[in-house]
């Protein structure tokens, strides 16, 4: 372990701290863990080290590590640091499709609303956000079209899930949902919950609910940390809102960070401070960073930041105006940190960006200012509008500090946090058991597609939606090889457009459009509607396209809503959110064989999940893999319908008739760059029909009817997370023969198939036969695993790991 740590940290003779070794030992023993340690102490390496050690030694600890963070900026920062460190030991790849299975290879990815590099959580180490993780658990992943919503939940099984900065979760929404998720996953995954500022009583209560061990650093361990041994960080309460004069006066050509609670406030303050420093200190570098920059523009600022505020920075005389995006984990430090009032645990997190390093940079001042007031004399709470009591308690606690500044060490900070947060956190946690039935009902309804407001109810009310600025949404192409760049914004920020929407259309200009999805993933198309009501806009599933008369963007200020901007061609990612490739002619038998081969190739990346599922359902792990193979072998039986075969053969006649044989087809030639405008012959649906066709055979040949239901539900939903509508269809005469040709050897005999369902059969299959998780809750883990394996195998099944779905 020590040698691995030394190599990860550049071979400079560093050894892990005792608490990091204790964390690693606990996790390697298969236990769950709560870790309380100060900012800058090395919590991240405490979580990563056991996973990397297991990978290096071949120990089966977890199939992947999912590192979950409350903020996108923090995910990006840790992602970059981990790549740099792991490159000293491993062969690092950054995309799942670049995997070569070499020895010591590790795939490190990031999936946030801003950086969508791993939409299906296929990396070995995945950095993501709370929104992404919890919404994936709910089968409603933010930033992804709803049709692919049931792929990511299965990635949680067999994983080591790290929830960092846990105290920053909304205690009445995301924290409760995360606890329910971890409770459900306990037989199937391991977890680490990490925090610097969660009240001690709250952590004890969570341990009672979830089990696991608690590791807290002693006073001696904290003082032994280089970043804390000589730290002198003073806190000062200022009973008035932030003003530019105070910032300029205390700056003194040093390093200053200003943190405010909203992007709008940051943009306004940046413009004012930039002007002020131009008058009084032309040499000062004034920077702006928040969540509404395109990745390239944001990266430029973050790179510049390290030169001024990073650990090895030599430059001084810089001012950064920012928001909560740097509240946790970003490795920068200032001499003076000015912040608007926020909940105390957030204040302490922000303070972690002041006097962060040893030596001369271990001294600094945190200035905390009163909030601005609205025209009615009420505090502008911004994102903390639901936490007014905590804000008031924080205000009272800070007002008792020495007006000249009071130096607080780690345990003095924790004592202050206990006084402010214990009562509310304890009340929320005490209600967890009382609210659990209602919470589960909402979660299970979301998993079934029956709770469209689940993200707002169960994660956070300001959950993000993607925004594009364009006056012609119909010209945006989502079915090409590029996917348009988007900016995630809190849904609440869309209320800036309310006055424009009240009349519906103003001066014949449409304000904002939302998409309605049609087609499968391989041919995803949108029709556009223009809401005239703000509630419609705020409830948009994942994307809003705003007319440039009502939104603007610049590399200096980022996205501004309610401010006109010039119309510009939307930027495109170099690879689409859901990759689409040219589809090749493929017979039914060839396709089934390739899907099964792809599933077998993924088996090694799912060993831990298979073993844990087998233990839970009293099966052997080999049986779990056989269930995956059965799903893959039978998933496209619905394509053996008369309508499907007539339609696909007609299209192939148009593309290249010389390829046609007597065999039924699974795919025809299709080039998304050339053929997307062409109207193809109707083939009807096939996914739910496939599930129905094989359902009776599964009942007859598996010894558990619920396992049969898991498989045919996964088949029915291998193109849509909530598909349930069964159409009338008739199979070709020799469908059973073709369906049995490529089956794995353990499937003996002829496959009997159903078709031509009566209207009552169609209703009964949708309502009674397909899994309903409110009724069939205990089978969600097995379903989530099998449907994920099936859909990913279906994507990867063409030569060269070309991805497609049809």
Stretches with model-predicted labels:
Residues 268-271, 275, 279-284, 288-303, ...:
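C-terminal helicase lobe and adjacent C-terminal extensions/tails of nucleic-acid helicase motors
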């Amino acid at each position: 372990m020590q040698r691995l740590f030394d190599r990860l940290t550049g071979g400079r003779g560093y050894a892990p701290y005792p608490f990091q070794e204790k964390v690693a030992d606990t996790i390697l023993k298969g236990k769950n863990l709560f870790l309380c340690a100060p900012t800058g102490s090395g919590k991240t390496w405490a979580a990563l080290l056991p996973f990397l050690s297991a990978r290096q030694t071949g120990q089966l600890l977890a199939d992947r590590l999912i590192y979950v963070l409350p903020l996108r900026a923090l995910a990006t920062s840790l992602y970059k640091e981990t790549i740099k460190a792991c490159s000293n030991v491993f062969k690092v790849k950054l995309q799942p499709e670049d995997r070569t299975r070499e020895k010591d290879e590790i795939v490190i990815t990031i999936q946030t609303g801003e950086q969508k590099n791993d939409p299906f959580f296929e990396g070995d180490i995945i950095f993501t956000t709370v929104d992404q993780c919890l919404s994936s658990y709910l089968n409603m992943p933010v930033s992804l079209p709803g049709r692919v919503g049931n792929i990511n939940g299965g990635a949680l099984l067999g994983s080591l899930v790290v929830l960092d900065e846990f105290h920053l979760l909304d205690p009445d929404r995301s924290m409760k949902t995360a606890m329910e998720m971890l409770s459900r996953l306990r037989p199937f995954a391991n977890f680490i919950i990490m925090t610097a500022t969660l009240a001690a009583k709250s952590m004890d209560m969570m341990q009672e609910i979830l089990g696991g061990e608690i590791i807290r650093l002693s006073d001696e361990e904290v003082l032994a940390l280089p970043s804390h041994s000589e730290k002198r960080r003073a806190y000062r309460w200022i009973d008035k809102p932030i003003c530019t004069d105070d910032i300029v006066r205390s700056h003194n050509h040093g390093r200053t960070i200003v943190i405010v609670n909203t992007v709008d406030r940051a943009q306004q303050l940046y413009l004012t401070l930039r002007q002020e420093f131009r008058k009084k200190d032309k040499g000062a570098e004034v920077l702006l960073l928040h969540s509404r920059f395109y990745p390239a523009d944001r990266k430029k600022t973050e790179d510049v930041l390290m030169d001024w505020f990073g650990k090895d920075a030599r430059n001084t005389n810089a001012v950064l105006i920012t928001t909560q995006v740097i509240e946790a984990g970003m490795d920068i430090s200032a001499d003076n940190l000015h912040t608007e009032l926020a909940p105390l645990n957030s204040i302490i997190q922000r303070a972690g960006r002041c006097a962060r390093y040893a030596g001369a940079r271990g001294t600094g001042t945190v200035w905390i200012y009163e909030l601005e007031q609205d025209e009615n004399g009420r505090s502008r709470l911004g994102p903390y509008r639901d936490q007014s009591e905590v804000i008031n308690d924080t205000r009272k606690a800070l007002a008792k500090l020495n007006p000249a500044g009071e130096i607080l060490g780690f345990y003095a900070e924790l004592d202050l946090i206990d006084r402010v947060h214990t009562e509310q956190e304890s009340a929320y946690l005490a209600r967890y058991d009382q609210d659990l039935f209602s919470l589960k009902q909402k979660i299970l309804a979301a998993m079934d597609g029956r709770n469209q407001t689940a993200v707002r109810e169960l994660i956070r009310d300001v959950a993000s939606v993607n925004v594009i600025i364009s006056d012609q949404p119909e010209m945006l192409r989502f079915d090409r090889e590029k996917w348009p760049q988007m900016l995630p914004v809190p849904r609440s920020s869309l209320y800036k457009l309310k006055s424009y929407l009240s009349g519906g259309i103003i001066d014949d200009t449409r304000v904002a459009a939302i998409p309605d999805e049609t087609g499968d993933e391989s041919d995803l198309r949108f029709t556009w509607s223009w809401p005239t009501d703000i509630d419609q806009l705020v409830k948009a599933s994942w994307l809003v396209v705003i007319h440039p008369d009502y939104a603007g963007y610049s590399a200096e200020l980022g996205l501004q809503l309610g401010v006109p901007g010039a119309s510009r061609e939307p930027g495109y990612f170099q690879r689409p959110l859901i990759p689409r490739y040219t589809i090749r002619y493929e017979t039914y038998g060839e396709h089934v064989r390739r899907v099964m081969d792809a599933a077998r190739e993924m088996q090694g990346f799912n060993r831990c999940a298979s073993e844990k599922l087998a233990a839970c359902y009293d099966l052997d792990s080999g049986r779990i893999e056989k269930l995956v193979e059965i799903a893959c072998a039978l998933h496209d039986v619905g394509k053996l319908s008369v309508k499907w075969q007539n339609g696909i053969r007609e299209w192939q006649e148009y593309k290249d008739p010389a390829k046609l044989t007597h065999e039924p087809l699974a795919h025809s030639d299709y080039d998304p760059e050339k053929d997307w405008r062409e109207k193809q012959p109707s083939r009807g649906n096939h996914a739910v029909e496939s599930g129905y066709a094989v359902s009776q055979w599964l009942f007859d040949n598996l010894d558990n009817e619920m396992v049969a239901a898991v498989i045919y539900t996964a088949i029915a939903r291998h193109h849509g997370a909530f598909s349930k509508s069964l159409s009338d269809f008739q199979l070709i005469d020799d469908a059973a023969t073709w369906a049995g040709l490529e089956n794995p050897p353990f499937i003996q005999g002829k496959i009997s198939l159903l078709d031509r369902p009566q209207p009552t059969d169609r209703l009964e299959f949708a309502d009674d036969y397909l899994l309903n998780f409110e009724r069939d809750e205990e089978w969600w883990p097995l379903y989530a695993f099998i449907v994920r394996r099936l859909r990913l195998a279906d994507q990867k099944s063409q030569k060269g790991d070309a991805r497609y779905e049809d």
